C-alpha cells in the first residue's frame, strides 16, 4: 500500500446540478442559460438550479414563485423524476464498477471506500472521466481521510471540482470559514456558537471542550468540537433503509396565528413531498409534530389506504391533523412526517443538519440527526 492510499481513505462524489444537467442533455440549446427545475403549482419549490441561475440567489427548496422573481429570465422546466432515477442508477453502476464498497446517500451523491487502492487520485480521475464520457454529466470529487473531510472537499470547488485534503489541510483551509460549512452545524447552532464568540471553524475547533459542553451538553458539545477539527469515525456502509422522512421548523418566536401555522406547514409539506418524489419514495402514514411554548410536545398521525408522495394529499391530511389538534398555546416548533416509506431508489438519509431544527431534544437525538449524512 502506498503512503497516499494509507492517508486518503474516502471519496465523496457529487454530480453537479444533477437534475439540471440531465435536462441539458435533452435541451443542449439551454447550456449557458439560467435554468430552474421546479413544479408549476402555486406552492411548487425549486428542486435544483443551474449555476447560472444560482448567481441570482436561486437555490434548492426555494419557493418557485420567489425563484422566478429573483431570476425572471430563467428557463423553468418541470421535473422528470423517472428519468433522474434512471440516470442515477447509470452513474452508480459505473461507480460500483470502479470501487467495491460504495455508500449511496442520494440520487446524485455517494461515499466511496478507497482503502486498498494504490493511487486513489488516479482512480478517481478515471472514474469521473468515464462518468462524463458515458453520461455527459460532470461530478465533483472530494478525497480525504474520513467522510467529513471528503464531503466538505467535494463542495469546495464546484462544479467539476477535484479537491484532495488531509485532515490538517482541511483545518487550515477552512479555519476562517463559518461553522455552517460543516454538515451538522446549521444556522441556529451557529447562532448559539456566536453567543460564545465562536464565529469560525478554527475558533470552534480550538475552543475549550468544557465551554462547548457547558453550552450544548456533553454529547453535542464534544461532537461540535470534533467536527470543527474534521475528526470523524464513521465508516462507509451500504445505504440504510429509510422508513420515514420529515421536515421541522423551530420558529424564531412563538406563533399563535393559525394562518401562519398553516402556511408554515404547507411550505414544509411542499419541500418534503419534493424530496420524496425525487427519491422515488411514498408512504402511508402522515403525521405532524407540535411543540408548544411550555415545551410540551404532541404528535398526531393518520394512515391512508395507499402510499403517496402527492403534495396535495399529504398537505390535506397534515392540515386536517393540525386543525383537529387546535393548539391552545403558542407554538414553538412545527413538523410534518411521512412514514411507512417504500422505495427501490437510492436513499438520502438526512433531512436536517441543524441541531436546533432537529427539535431542541436531548443531545443523543441531535447527534443521531447529525450523523446521518456523514
Identify the function of each model-found stretch.
Residues 3-5, 174, 181, 189-333, ...:
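DNA-contacting surface of Y-family translesion DNA polymerases
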Residues 1-223, 342-374:
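Gly/Gly-Pro- and Ser/Thr-rich, intrinsically disordered tail segments characteristic of DNA damage-repair
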Residues 109, 333-335:
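Extracellular/lumenal ectodomain signal focusing on beta-strand-rich modules
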Amino acid at each position: 500500500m502506498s503512503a497516499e492510499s494509507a492517508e486518503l481513505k474516502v471519496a465523496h462524489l457529487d454530480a453537479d446540478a444533477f437534475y439540471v444537467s440531465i435536462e441539458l442533455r435533452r435541451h443542449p440549446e439551454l447550456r449557458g442559460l439560467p435554468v430552474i427545475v421546479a413544479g408549476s403549482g402555486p406552492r411548487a419549490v425549486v428542486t435544483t438550479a443551474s449555476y447560472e441561475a444560482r448567481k441570482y440567489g436561486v437555490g434548492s427548496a426555494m419557493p418557485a414563485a420567489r425563484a422566478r422573481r429573483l431570476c425572471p429570465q430563467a428557463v423553468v422546466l418541470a421535473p422528470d423524476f423517472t428519468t433522474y432515477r434512471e440516470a442515477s442508477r447509470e452513474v452508480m453502476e459505473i461507480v460500483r464498477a470502479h470501487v467495491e464498497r460504495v455508500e449511496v446517500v442520494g440520487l446524485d451523491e455517494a461515499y466511496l471506500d478507497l482503502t486498498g487502492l494504490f493511487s486513489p487520485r488516479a482512480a478517481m480521475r478515471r472514474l469521473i472521466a468515464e462518468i462524463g464520457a458515458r453520461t455527459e454529466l460532470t461530478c465533483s470529487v472530494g478525497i480525504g481521510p474520513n467522510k467529513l473531510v471528503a464531503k466538505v472537499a467535494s463542495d469546495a470547488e464546484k462544479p467539476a471540482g477535484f479537491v484532495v485534503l488531509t485532515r490538517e489541510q482541511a483545518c487550515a483551509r477552512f479555519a476562517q470559514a463559518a461553522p455552517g460549512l460543516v454538515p451538522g452545524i446549521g444556522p441556529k447552532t451557529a447562532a448559539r456558537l456566536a453567543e460564545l464568540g465562536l464565529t469560525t471553524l478554527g475558533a470552534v475547533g480550538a475552543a475549550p471542550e468544557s465551554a462547548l459542553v457547558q453550552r450544548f451538553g456533553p454529547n453535542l458539545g464534544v461532537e461540535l468540537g470534533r467536527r470543527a477539527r474534521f475528526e470523524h469515525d464513521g465508516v462507509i456502509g451500504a445505504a440504510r433503509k429509510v422508513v420515514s422522512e420529515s421536515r421541522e421548523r423551530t420558529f424564531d418566536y412563538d406563533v399563535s396565528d393559525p394562518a401562519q401555522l398553516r402556511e408554515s406547514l404547507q411550505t414544509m409539506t411542499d419541500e418534503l413531498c419534493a424530496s420524496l418524489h425525487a427519491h422515488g419514495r411514498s408512504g402511508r402514514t402522515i403525521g405532524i409534530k407540535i411543540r408548544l411554548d411550555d415545551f410540551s410536545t404532541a404528535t398526531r398521525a393518520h394512515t391512508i389506504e395507499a402510499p403517496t408522495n402527492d403534495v396535495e394529499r399529504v398537505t390535506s391530511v397534515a392540515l386536517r391533523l393540525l386543525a383537529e389538534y387546535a393548539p391552545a398555546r403558542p407554538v414553538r416548533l412545527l413538523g410534518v412526517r411521512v412514514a411507512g416509506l417504500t422505495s427501490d431508489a437510492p436513499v438520502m438519509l438526512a433531512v436536517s443538519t441543524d441541531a436546533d431544527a432537529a427539535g431542541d431534544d436531548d443531545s443523543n437525538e441531535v447527534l443521531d440527526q447529525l450523523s446521518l449524512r456523514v
